[in-house]
Amino acid sequence: ELIKEKGFIVNNDTECISFLKQANYYRLSAYFLPFRKKNGTYFADISFNRIQRIYKFDSKLRGVLFNCIERIELHLRTQLAYYCGHVYGSLGYMDKSIYNKKHNHDKFRKLLNVCIEENKNSLVVKHHKEKYDGKFPIWVIIEFFSMGMLSYFYADLQSGDQKYIAKEIYDTSVACLKSWLRCITDLRNRCAHYSRLYYWSFTALPKMPKESVAPQNRKLFSQILVLKRLYPDKKEWNSKVMTELRAVIEEYEDDISLKHIGFPQDWYEQLER
């Protein structure tokens, strides 16, 4: 009844109730926002079926992007572990002298302990506690870092290390890479917690090199530009990610509005590598 009271057209009450049992009303109500007028009422002739399809589009879109971020995250782990292990040794990350002046080593060690405690039942953790007195090489401990922790770890390295990683691995500046890691941490968290991407404005506007296409809004498109720059395999980005992204958009193109995810008309050309 709440759906009908707002003016949405419900063609099948049974299907509507069934859907609401899967997606609770509070979560679903956020998808009403694009159809709300300034006075709080809603536009006429909007079907509940369209709301459902936008909801499903958002869900599938999160799936595509989450898989993409996972690929980026695994690559970042590998690169940070290899670099720091090569330059500072397997346990060098425990030495506060390798970090910059903003680094809070006590906080960092507490975060490491949290990582270990949260994974205390892992065979890897048990093995290193029993055999190596709880000393974890960088390439082991980093596997338990969250995306936010990886971003924090990079931001606290010495400037020379930051520059090398940004330039040699990601072909960008330190400022851009720091910004990008913060952005994908936020995006990853939204995807992981089933949060809405459609008609959503992100807090951070990613920093882009001067020669690049700069995002003009805080919608999803600006975040996907970041994924494009960080994705480790150019060929796979075009053949897999872009194919999946286009398929989801084409499936729901009659119900969604690209402007609500910040996509320009030439979005495919801008995102292709």
Question: Which positions does each model-derived feature cover?
Answer:
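Extended intrinsically disordered or low-complexity regions, especially N/C-terminal cytosolic tails and loops
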Residues: 1-186, 198-273
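Acidic/aromatic/glycine-rich contiguous surface patches that form carbohydrate-binding/processing clefts
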Residues: 194
